[in-house]
């Protein structure tokens, strides 16, 4: 049975993800429309946010472990509210990029704390708790991207700031009730149940290491695709609202993957599933960026979302299926995401800047980087077998 405290934390997670997607993913439409940002500028903005994400998430996990998750969520929500308020006041390109970085710090304090709160003291219920966590944030993200474009067209670009700000205030209003229920839960005597076992203890560390390799590369792909969606939409003559609808399919596919892999656990500690999803991601990444029709774009998105769903699920599940240091592991899990958020768009921007006339050079360079990541995955697996 899920405790009332965890239900409220899942609700906070849902609201937070919707607000985060509404702001961060459609910021690139705002920058393109308001300041004339092209592919290089949008990719560089995404890369800068990714670099901040690495440090903020890593430290966020440590701070959650040291000072408590509830306190850190309060601080993170405060940072998000402050940054979005500044975004409404200062409307130059430079200040908007700085606001994005400040917002990233705030949200990076929230995610590791939420991951820790829903997985702590779960015992044998861990797969269920992580499954609900993944389905919840994926649902918030998918619905957020699907509806954000339409809402922005109706409410105006200013809603990019005030709507997520208002949702974050709602999170702050819910948090005291969640903290009160959590305190009651912690005061109760609970029977410790063992974690879900791997094949052997060595496999636990091996699969955690491999998942921490694969997950950053999945975000290399994601954070290269998202800043380029305004360009894809322009190429296919899609409005902002239609781009949100059409290009949200991969998020719904990821949601379906989370739901399936939550209910079916046969993929736990199975290398073929992790490797196969990595290969599928690479193929569909090229299909996503190089599609010349909406039909091909939709097909590529389905494979893209399914593969990323398993890769992310593996990273979070293996990070939490340990006996201690949940906060630190959650922070490292998020920091690995930040590494991907930085490297992907940085690589794409660099190649577009150096070879601007080459057709599809950004996609090919990042695709090559993904192939390097897959080789690293095989190398880690091979080293384990040989040893």
Question: What feature does the model see in each segment?
Answer:
Residues 109-122, 309-324:
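Intracellular juxtamembrane helix-capping segments at the cytosolic ends
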Residues 101-135:
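Cytoplasmic helix-loop-helix junction between adjacent transmembrane helices
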Residues 71-85, 165, 272-286:
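Structural signature of the two symmetry-related core transmembrane helices
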Residues 150-167, 350-370:
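A membrane-interface helix-boundary motif in multi-pass transporters
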Residues 325-354:
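A late C-terminal transmembrane helix in Major Facilitator Superfamily
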């Amino acid at each position: 049975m899920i405790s009332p405290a965890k239900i409220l934390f899942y609700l906070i997670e849902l609201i937070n993800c919707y607000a985060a997607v509404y702001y961060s993913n459609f910021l690139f439409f705002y920058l393109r429309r308001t300041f004339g940002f092209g592919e290089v500028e949008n990719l560089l903005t995404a890369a800068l946010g990714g670099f901040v994400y690495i440090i903020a998430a890593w430290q966020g996990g440590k701070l959650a472990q040291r000072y408590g998750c509830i306190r850190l969520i309060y601080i993170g929500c405060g940072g998000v509210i402050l940054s979005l308020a500044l975004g409404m006041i200062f409307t130059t390109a430079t200040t908007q990029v700085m606001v994005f970085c400040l917002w990233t710090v705030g949200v990076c304090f929230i995610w590791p704390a939420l991951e820790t709160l829903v997985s702590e003291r779960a015992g044998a219920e861990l797969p269920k708790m992580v499954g609900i966590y993944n389905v919840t944030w994926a649902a918030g993200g998918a619905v957020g991207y699907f509806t954000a474009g339409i809402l922005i067209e109706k409410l105006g670009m200013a809603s990019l700031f005030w709507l997520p700000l208002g949702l974050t205030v709602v999170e702050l209003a819910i948090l005291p009730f969640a903290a009160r229920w959590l305190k009651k839960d912690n005061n109760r005597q609970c029977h410790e149940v063992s974690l879900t076992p791997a094949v052997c203890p060595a496999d636990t560390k091996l699969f955690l290491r491999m998942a921490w390799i694969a997950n950053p590369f999945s975000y290399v792909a994601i954070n290269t695709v998202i800043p380029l969606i305004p360009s894809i939409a322009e190429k296919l003559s899609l409005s902002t609202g239609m781009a949100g609808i059409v290009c949200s399919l991969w998020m719904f596919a990821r949601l379906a993957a989370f739901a399936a892999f939550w209910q079916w656990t046969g993929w736990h500690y199975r290398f073929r599933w992790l490797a196969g999803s990595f290969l599928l991601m690479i193929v569909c990444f090229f299909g996503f960026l190089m599609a010349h029709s909406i039909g091909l774009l939709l097909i590529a998105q389905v494979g893209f979302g399914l593969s990323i769903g398993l890769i992310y699920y593996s990273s979070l599940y293996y990070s939490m299926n340990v006996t201690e240091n949940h906060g630190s592991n959650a922070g490292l899990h998020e920091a690995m995401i930040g590494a991907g958020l930085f490297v992907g768009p940085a690589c794409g921007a660099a190649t577009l800047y150096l070879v601007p006339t080459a057709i599809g050079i950004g996609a090919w360079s990042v695709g090559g980087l993904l192939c390097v990541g897959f080789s690293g995955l095989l190398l880690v697996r091979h080293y384990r077998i040989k040893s």
